Amino acid sequence: MNIIIKKFGGTSVSSIDKIERAISYIKKARKAGYYVVVVVSAMGKDTDRLLKITAGLDDYKKSDDISSLLSAGEQISSSLFSILLNKNSIKGKSFQGWQIPIHTDLSYYNSHILKIETQHIKKS
């Protein structure tokens, strides 16, 4: 089975209704014979909201704590997306980058992916 990656940005996952619409695209891809890996952004403007909270903390923006803070939005949307996939009888499992794992260049605020280990994705 061929793998396809579907990426949904913040606007596409900003509400339950919009996530349900995104799931309709996943259903179509599965019907066409694809194994679908979904990548989601934080819901709506969550990342912008988190960045505003850190205004004035420029000295810390290159720390792993800022990356952890900013990833909170993606953790919420990926978990919710997975819940709704399962509600729609599509097996879903949310993963964070460290769980897969995804290896990066360790530039916390603007990382580049070096390697993705796919065995956990393939098992789920």
Model-derived features: positions:
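Nucleotide/pyrophosphate-binding catalytic subdomain
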Residues: 1-124
